[in-house]
Amino acid sequence: MRLLLDLGNSAIKWAVVPPGGAAWQTGRLAYADGAGPEDTAAALGGRIPSTVAPARICVASVLAPAWQRRFDTALERAWGGPVQHLVASAAAAGVTNGYDQPEQLGVDRWAALIGARAVAPEGACIVDVGTAITVDGLDADGRHLGGAIFPGARLLHQALARGTARLPDSPIGAAALPARSTEEGIAAGVAVGAGAAVTALADAILAACPPGAQRLITGGGGGELAAGLSPAWCHRPYLVLEGLLHWSRHEARR
């Protein structure tokens, strides 16, 4: 049994995977304001069934190293299993990193690429919608073709609120156009702008991918964004965790 953890900037996604990989238990835990690593680990423990006894705890984390070390210690105390961290490298689990400096690639993107390799061996364009939106290409030989980074909806809202004197930090959501209030105008502008940016970036990256490349979308905002894209896009909400599992199995066979 494995416990898979995707520690993003806004929330933790988790999955408990039994031997054989069938019947995943999954969930999401948003970080509480002011909560430290120990409190966060305790909150996570409250979400995961008490019967879970993982042989391995596999982690992809974008959080600060000092915070992460304390969190790892709390995980080991709670579950006893060793904590294994995926880190971006030149190559892993059949994927070759396309960055000039491989360690610069975010580990969440690296995990998503490994997951995409497992589910789309013909190649893929991967969109990950989180605090930031990333778009990456993968060819049929497992080579990462590079990608792009764009601010997510929350960052776009915050940029308008902080960079102007009178625009509010309005709620995220769709709105009709033409909008008839400032809040609706911001919501519509961000939603349509982010969708258009993703479409343009994905089209450019797909041009470098094999003709049969799959279109995969993941991340906390992936479902909402996918609803506004063409039906060719496949929503895989746990692609990062799928990549973690594939990497962990690959490492176990080495």
UniProtKB/Swiss-Prot annotation:
Subcellular location: Cytoplasm
Quaternary structure (record): Homodimer.
Cofactor note as given: A monovalent cation. Ammonium or potassium.
InterPro entries the UniProt entry points to: ATPase_NBD (IPR043129), Type_III_PanK (IPR004619)
EC code: 2.7.1.33
Enzyme category, top tier: transferase
Protein family per UniProt: Belongs to the type III pantothenate kinase family.
Pathway: Cofactor biosynthesis; coenzyme A biosynthesis; CoA from (R)-pantothenate: step 1/5
Molecular function terms, GO-annotated: ATP binding; metal ion binding; pantothenate kinase activity
Residues involved in K(+) binding: 128
Keyword Transport among UniProt keywords: no
Main location group: cytoplasm
Reaction catalysis annotation: (R)-pantothenate + ATP = (R)-4'-phosphopantothenate + ADP + H(+)
GO biological process: coenzyme A biosynthetic process
Residue ranges that the Swiss-Prot or TrEMBL entry lists as coiled coil: none
Cofactor(s) listed in the protein's UniProt record: NH4(+); K(+)
Binding residues for substrate: 99, 106-109, 182
A Pfam short name: Pan_kinase
Role, per record: Catalyzes the phosphorylation of pantothenate (Pan), the first step in CoA biosynthesis.
Positions annotated to bind ATP: 6-13, 131
Active site: 108
GO annotation, cellular component aspect: cytoplasm
Protein name listed in UniProt: Type III pantothenate kinase
